[in-house]
Amino acid sequence: VLVDSEILVAKAFAKYMQNFGVDIDEKEFASFAGKKTVQVIDILSKKYSIKDQERFFTNIMDIASNIYKKELTTVKGAYDFVSNSKLNMFIGSNSMKERIIDGLQRVKLDKYFKPEQVYSFDLVDNPKPDPDVYLKDLEDNNLIKTETIIIEDSAVGVMAGVAANVKVIGLTAGGHWHEKRDEKELLEAGAFAVTNDYKKIFKLIESN
């Protein structure tokens, strides 16, 4: 929800899959939103009979890294939200910690998040939609669930937050939320509200 990486990962997969004569549309990528890269690779490998998943992963990471260097930006409104916030903030992600920190550095958000404020799937047993990453964050920092709100941009993430018994705001400001995607996806996953504007997040937090 901070760095606009999902759309860039989609570009990396689209580029790589062309090697197999496969064109993947936005609708198919939307179904992967919030999933770990290795999970997406497993799904595509089985669907399109790609045997070498290790090579698949290495190539995708190389392509994605090159795209990141040139195109990675913050989600619209994210920088202002973070820089103006006096809230106690943490990150809970299905990405790897090293990758998250690198992304924060690239978009100049690293000064707002210390490494210990970043929680990633490699720190827990199960990735989202299981609640492990959020439960670890809550426990490590003695956070009170009723005083905590999670902001998520995927159904997988929303389900993880709800499973952790925390209120979730759905955010559709990222580039992967193309016009054909319906915010109902996040509401049905359990978000109590959905917005496409970071400026509205503070009001939603205050009202809850």
Report each predicted region and the residues it spans:
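Short helix-capping segments at alpha-helix termini
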Residues: 19-22, 48-51, 108-112, 142-143
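Helix-loop "lid/cap" segments that line or gate small-molecule binding pockets
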Residues: 16-17, 36-50, 103, 138, ...
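Metal-dependent phosphoesterase signature
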Residues: 23, 43-80
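Asp-based, Mg2+/Mn2+-dependent phosphohydrolase catalytic module
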Residues: 96-208
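Asp-based phosphoryl-transfer active-site loop
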Residues: 1-8
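Short, acidic loop-to-helix structural element flanking the phosphoryl-transfer center
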Residues: 66-91, 97, 101
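Conserved SAM-binding loop
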Residues: 2, 89-92, 150-151
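Conserved phosphoryl-transfer catalytic core
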Residues: 9-31
